């Protein structure tokens, strides 16, 4: 089992709007699943080397490499998938043609094939993840308890995963089509869960909702929603109501400052504090409204806090700990 919420899932696909922190959440998820001596593999497919930056390590090659040890002795490995190398892998795995593939690369055919046909590129990238899932069936192979794929953003996630549909214009039959069908057999199964990362802002939430509907339309398995960078609420409902009604005045804040013996110009400070309080209240109302829209999806939700010190390896450990506390096991 990889988690109590998704007991049959071997492949966790993580997507999100740009800037929502999907790579951070993918890395923390890999850490959370690498518990009690388990091994997870964290994969990226966009060529950004975001994983290497998070783990403060050298750029990842097209080779599985350990990047962290999880609490309890688990391990997190990482892999940056290159479409050209994945095509060479495909030629070698199914046709024993790696040497021929190397010759094709020299002629520029490999680059041409992976650039001119985006459907082929996606089936190669997703195919590598699915090959690693199926590797568990091979005796003696290095296997993982869970694979976490840092996938493209929400605007492209359904097309990226719907490899048979996107490849239909390129190949209706033949080996590439059979390979796509094999890949789809993993992606559309209970072995896979697609998780979405969002912020409590209107556009990221709308993209998340649209992505969930699109994934459902393609019968792709949706996992949970990770609400990232959540700020602590400074006011309770009663205090929010007082701010909204204008009941809290500058004079009241001045009295509080003087009672607390805060030095400086009390009235000027009170005006600034009250303005900031109204801004925070506005932000809280926005976040509450967007959170309600996420709740309406009826999916498991994980609220991840904004880290005051930024995201580093220590921050990943903290996010992983919070994920486990919220039900990921």
Question: What is each residue range found by the language model?
Answer:
Residues 98-210:
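Phosphate/Mg2+-binding loops and adjacent switch elements
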Residues 49-54, 86-90, 155-160, 205-206, ...:
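Switch/connector loops and helix/strand junctions flanking conserved nucleotide-binding motifs
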Residues 64-105:
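A conserved catalytic-core segment of Leloir-type glycosyltransferases
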Residues 6, 33-36, 70-74, 137-142, ...:
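Conserved catalytic network of the ASCE P-loop NTPase/AAA+ motor domain
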Residues 1-6, 188, 192, 202-329:
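C-terminal lobe/tail of nucleotide-utilizing enzymes
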């Amino acid at each position: 089992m990889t988690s109590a919420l998704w007991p049959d899932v071997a492949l966790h696909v993580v997507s999100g709007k740009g800037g929502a922190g999907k790579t951070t959440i993918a890395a923390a998820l890999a850490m959370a699943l690498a518990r009690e001596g388990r091994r997870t593999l964290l994969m990226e497919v966009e060529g950004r080397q975001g994983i290497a930056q998070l783990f403060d390590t050298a750029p990842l090659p097209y080779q599985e490499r350990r990047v962290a040890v999880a609490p309890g002795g688990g391990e997190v490995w990482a892999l940056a998938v290159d479409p050209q190398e994945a095509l060479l892998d495909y030629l070698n795995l199914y046709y024993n043609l790696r040497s021929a593939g190397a010759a094709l690369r020299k002629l520029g055919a490999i680059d041409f094939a992976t650039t001119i046909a985006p459907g082929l590129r996606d089936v190669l990238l997703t195919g590598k993840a699915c090959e690693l899932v199926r590797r568990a069936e091979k005796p003696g192979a290095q296997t993982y308890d869970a694979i976490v794929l840092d996938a493209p953003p929400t605007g492209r996630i359904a097309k990226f995963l719907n490899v048979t549909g996107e490849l239909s214009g390129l190949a209706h039959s033949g080996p590439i089509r059979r390979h796509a069908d094999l890949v789809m057999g993993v992606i559309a199964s209970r072995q896979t869960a697609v998780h979405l990362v969002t912020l409590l802002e209107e556009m990221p939430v709308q993209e998340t909702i649209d992505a969930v509907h699109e994934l459902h339309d393609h019968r792709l398995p949706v996992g949970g929603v990770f609400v990232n960078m959540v700020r602590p609420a400074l006011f309770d409902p009663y205090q929010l109501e007082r701010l909204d009604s204008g009941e809290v005045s500058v004079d009241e804040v001045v009295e509080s400052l003087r009672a607390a013996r805060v030095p400086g110009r009390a009235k000027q400070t009170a005006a600034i504090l009250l303005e900031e309080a109204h801004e925070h209240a506005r932000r809280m109302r926005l976040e509450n409204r967007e959170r309600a829209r996420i709740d309406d999806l009826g999916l498991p939700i994980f609220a991840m806090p904004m880290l005051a010190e930024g995201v580093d390896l220590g921050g990943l450990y903290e996010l992983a700990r919070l994920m486990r506390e919220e039900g990921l096991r």
